């Protein structure tokens, strides 16, 4: 008979036959989600022959799957690691360490696997292992737990040898542990288990009349086969409490009786007849049904719940419900309030179906309500929004890397970070324009000349602080109130006259509302939004203002307008973007960072057609 023990030795034998050194691999399970590969490596670093560790992650989200592997050159060190680290705490959670069995047949054949149930809550992995280790070498031992770490009351023990499993079953089954009788039996896969419905003999019935007697029930069920016993539950007045049990000699007779009598009228009521279940079994079934229903409702609510903001503070929940009830049946409405009970200007409306929620978004998004335009969208959890931002940020950075490596000419500045991906705009790189060490300028053919302030080495900065990087190891800054110099090299671009007339000292013109620029192109509108957002973001996160502004510009234009009016909402969005940048693996300080900083300071007011 094949065993896990034999599979392990077979793996070693195959390894020793090759030129590579013999290695031993351990499975490390039940890891805390916060455990990284570095933490995992440090946990096993005391064993000198440790070669590597691997933490398994979800391919789409990158989140830990809470298990991994540790690889050793020495099998002796691996054995020692199991003894020391199994059932030890790592980041506040008890971990499991066992041999890694790569052969699928050896993992799944169930040889030596024992199922234990009705365990007291005090029984942990370590206690369970101590109970069974006297019967033989244990490969794996686990007590099933809930999310909060509490025991589910059952567990599994896998031995190297099948004989050890048989001995454990014979000895420990029906023994008392902490005043509870435990069950120990051979583990069987769900596909191999005999369904209870196929062999039950005991039936439960309810909806009985108070005056029903055992003779009447026996007469009713005797036609299906031999009855072993029949019992009616009675109250203190010897009247039927509405339910009873009947036990047949043959499971087939019991099945036929349940199928035939269930739902039929007996006396004044319709009977329910089904397989009699133990209390623990009924509770487990009810828990599963509740969990299934809860998950179903959760999934429906996830796509049926809408987020509404920019709500007038005078609006009540009842008014909000009445306004949105035009689109369907509302199950709940909630306006968020501060500690004083004053509305925060946003809330949630949950519909009965996802279709109604989508209709509400299409109908009410941007609609005026009590003098303010509503922002309406499908509600998202903070984690989901963060993950979405991470994906968008990662895709944009990859595209930026590929485009910069393929198309950016040497000696040019990359475009502003927040102007990479908006439709309708073609962005060009800006060539270096140095005529001398301290002057820079530009001119435009067939149009007005635009004066750019010169850059002077080591001059004090007056317009922006800490936004200019180092160029040629010298600090540079803008000198205001300068004229067009003849020492400047020309830079040709086809800008509109309106864009030519803008300079960086004209801050008032940058703050014109979007409504006054409806005739401009979509690209110019997004550029202007970027110009308005950038100084606000810079006050919150000076070092990452360019990148965060670019991430915000991926949002809907109507929401961007609301962010400009609401400093609180803007701060929340900036915090979310900062967390995304912080958690990403991307190197935020690229070699050409000073170029982006120069553009952020020097040409943020110029849009390109």
Curated annotation (Swiss-Prot):
Q: Which GO terms describe its molecular function?
A: RNA binding
The miscellaneous remark of the record is:
A.thaliana contains 8 PABP genes.
This protein's GO CC annotations: cytoplasm; nucleus
Question: So which tissues is this one expressed in?
Answer: Expressed predominantly in siliques.
Protein name per UniProt = Polyadenylate-binding protein 7
Q: Which UniProt keywords apply?
A: Cytoplasm, Nucleus, Repeat, RNA-binding, Translation regulation
Please list the residue ranges annotated as the RRM domain. 24-102, 112-189, 201-278, 304-381
Q: Where is the PABC domain?
A: 509-586
Gene that this sequence comes from:
PAB7
Q: Which PROSITE patterns match?
A: PABC, RRM
Q: Which family is this sequence assigned to?
A: Belongs to the polyadenylate-binding protein type-1 family.
This molecule's function is given as: Binds the poly(A) tail of mRNA. Appears to be an important mediator of the multiple roles of the poly(A) tail in mRNA biogenesis, stability and translation.
InterPro entries named among the record's database cross-references: Nucleotide-bd_a/b_plait_sf, PABP-dom, PABP_1234, PABP_HYD_C, RBD_domain_sf, RRM2_I_PABPs, RRM_dom, RRM_dom_euk
Q: Where in the cell is it found?
A: Cytoplasm; Nucleus
GO BP annotation list? regulation of translation
């Amino acid at each position: 008979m094949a065993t896990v023990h034999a599979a392990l030795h077979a793996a070693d034998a195959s390894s020793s036959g090759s030129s590579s050194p013999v290695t031993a691999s351990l499975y490390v399970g039940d890891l805390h989600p916060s455990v990284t590969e570095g933490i995992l490596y440090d946990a096993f670093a005391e064993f000198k022959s440790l070669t590597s560790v691997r933490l398994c992650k979800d391919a789409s989200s990158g989140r830990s799957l809470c298990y991994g592997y540790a690889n050793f050159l020495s099998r002796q060190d691996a054995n020692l690691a199991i003894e020391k680290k199994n059932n030890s705490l790592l980041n506040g959670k008890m971990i499991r360490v066992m041999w890694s069995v790569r052969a699928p047949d050896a993992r799944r054949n169930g040889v030596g696997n024992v199922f234990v149930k009705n365990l007291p809550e005090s029984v942990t992995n370590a206690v369970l292992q101590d109970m069974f280790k006297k019967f033989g070498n244990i490969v794996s031992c686990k007590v099933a737990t809930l999310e909060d770490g509490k025991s589910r009351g059952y567990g599994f023990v896998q031995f190297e040898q099948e004989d050890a499993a048989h001995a454990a079953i014979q000895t420990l089954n029906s023994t008392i542990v902490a005043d509870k009788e435990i069950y120990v039996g051979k583990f069987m896969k769900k596909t191999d288990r005999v369904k209870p419905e196929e062999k039950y003999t005991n039936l439960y019935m309810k909806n009985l009349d108070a005056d029903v007697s055992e003779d009447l029930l026996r007469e009713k069920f005797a036609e299906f086969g031999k009855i072993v016993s029949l019992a009616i539950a009675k109250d203190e007045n010897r009247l039927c409490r509405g339910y009873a049990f009947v036990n047949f000699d043959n499971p087939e007779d019991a099945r036929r009786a349940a199928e035939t009598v269930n739902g039929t009228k007996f006396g004044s009521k319709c009977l329910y007849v089904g397989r009699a279940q133990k209390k623990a079994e009924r509770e487990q079934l009810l828990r599963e049904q509740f969990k299934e229903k809860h998950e179903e409702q959760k999934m429906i609510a996830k796509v049926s719940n809408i987020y509404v903001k920019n709500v007038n503070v005078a609006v009540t929940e009842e008014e909000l419900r009445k306004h949105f009830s035009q689109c369907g049946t509302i199950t709940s409405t909630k306006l968020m309030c501060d500690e004083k009970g004053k509305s925060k200007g946003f809330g949630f409306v949950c519909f009965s179906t996802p279709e109604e929620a989508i209709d509400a978004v299409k109908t009410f998004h941007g609609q005026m309500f009590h003098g303010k335009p509503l922002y309406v969208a499908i509600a998202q959890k903070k984690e989901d929004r963060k993950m979405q931002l991470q994906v968008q940020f990662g895709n944009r950075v990859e595209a930026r890397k590929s485009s910069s490596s393929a198309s950016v000419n040497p000696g040019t500045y990359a475009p502003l970070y927040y102007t990479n991906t908006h439709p309708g705009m073609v962005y060009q790189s800006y060539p270096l324009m140095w005529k001398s060490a301290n002057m820079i300028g530009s001119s435009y053919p067939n149009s007005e000349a635009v004066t750019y302030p010169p850059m002077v080495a080591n001059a004090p900065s007056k317009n922006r602080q800490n936004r200019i990087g180092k160029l040629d190891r010298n600090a540079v800054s803008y000198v205001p109130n300068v004229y067009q110099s003849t020492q400047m090299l020309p830079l040709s671009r086809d800008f509109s006259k309106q864009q030519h007339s803008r300079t960086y000292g004209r801050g008032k013109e940058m703050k014109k509302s979007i409504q006054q620029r409806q005739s401009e192109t979509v690209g110019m509108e997004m550029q202007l939004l970027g110009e308005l957002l950038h100084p606000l973001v810079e006050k919150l996160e000076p070092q990452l203002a360019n990148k965060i502004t670019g991430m915000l510009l991926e949002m809907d234009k109507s929401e961007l307008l609301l962010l400009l009016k609401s400093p609180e909402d803007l701060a929340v969005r900036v915090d979310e973007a900062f967390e995304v940048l912080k958690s990403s693996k991307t190197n935020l300080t690229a070699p050409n960072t000073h170029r982006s900083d120069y553009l952020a300071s020097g040409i943020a007011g110029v849009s390109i057609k």
